[in-house]
From Swiss-Prot:
This is N-demethylindolmycin N-methyltransferase. Involved in the biosynthesis of the antibiotic indolmycin, an inhibitor of the bacterial tryptophan-tRNA synthetases. Catalyzes the methylation of N-demethylindolmycin to yield indolmycin, with S-adenosylmethionine (AdoMet) acting as the methyl donor. It holds the Pfam family Methyltransf_25. InterPro entries: Methyltransf_25, SAM-dependent_MTases_sf. Disruption phenotype: Cells lacking this gene accumulate N-demethylindolmycin and are unable to produce indolmycin. Belongs to the methyltransferase superfamily. It comes from Streptomyces griseus.
């Protein structure tokens, strides 16, 4: 089971399986909509921040489809190396942030931030709040933070390719929770943590975001499972 991404093998395993799962409909359209990527003048827009960019396929997609500049950061040097080698783009800057700091960015210079499947990897709520606070410092007034995670109300439910947690188990906030992604490329097991909807909302509100809202997202169209699979939490700087 993967608990960190500091080896090239772990990063490549993650990239291979998430690509095979067809990542784009897995909550990402709602993220892009929240950041108004399709309606913003890309020539004059400030860059987008991707906090926890992983192997970079989302960032290249944003650059290619929407023409937006992206600053993509990750604590894993292996993920950044993989992103630079496989998903480079003139509009995307990849940066390794081993200490999770964003000090290289100025105050209020970012036009929006996405952070996908990152807060659910954090073992304590104080860390979640601190990361959101660091992000908020970089955002222009009125800019949006869009946080995407799997839906905590669907723990234990088997979707087409994904299951979070064990069936019939009751989790408490902060409990370790195994995520299992099954594709034709193999089985990927990830170490995540259980957090309620209210915990994610708290992380943004405690960091100073306002107008915090939630959206309960269904699985991709090809998956008929009648439960929300993803949770999007949005807040305005």
């Amino acid at each position: 089971m993967h608990t960190d991404w500091e080896t090239s093998e772990s990063a490549e395993d993650y990239s291979r399986n998430t690509a095979a799962a067809q990542w784009e409909p897995m909550g990402y359209p709602a993220v892009f909509r929240s950041l108004a990527l399709a309606t913003t003048d890309s020539d004059n827009a400030p860059p987008i921040l991707d906090y926890g960019c992983g192997p970079g396929f989302v960032d290249r997609h944003v650059a290619e489809k929407y023409g937006r500049r992206v600053i993509a950061v990750d604590i894993s040097s292996s993920m950044i190396d993989l992103a630079r080698s496989q998903h480079s783009h003139p509009l995307v800057t990849y940066r390794h942030v081993p200490d999770s700091q964003l000090d290289f960015l100025g105050d209020k210079e970012i036009g929006g931030c996405m952070s996908c499947f990152v807060l659910m990897q954090m073992a304590d709520s104080d860390t979640q709040v601190e990361i959101c606070r660091r992000i908020r410092r970089t955002l222009a007034p009125g800019a949006m933070l869009a946080v995407l995670n799997t839906h905590p109300d669907s723990v234990g439910i088997q979707f087409a390719t994904l299951r979070n947690g064990e069936p019939d188990r009751v989790y408490q906030p902060g409990d370790p929770m195994t995520t299992v992604l099954t594709t034709d490329k193999g089985v990927l097991r990830l170490q995540d943590y259980y957090w309620r909807v209210t915990d994610y909302v708290h992380a943004l509100e405690a960091a100073g975001f306002h107008e915090v809202t939630v959206e309960h997202l269904p699985p991709p169209p090809a998956d008929p499972t009648p439960h929300p699979q993803f949770l999007l939490v949005r807040g305005t700087a």
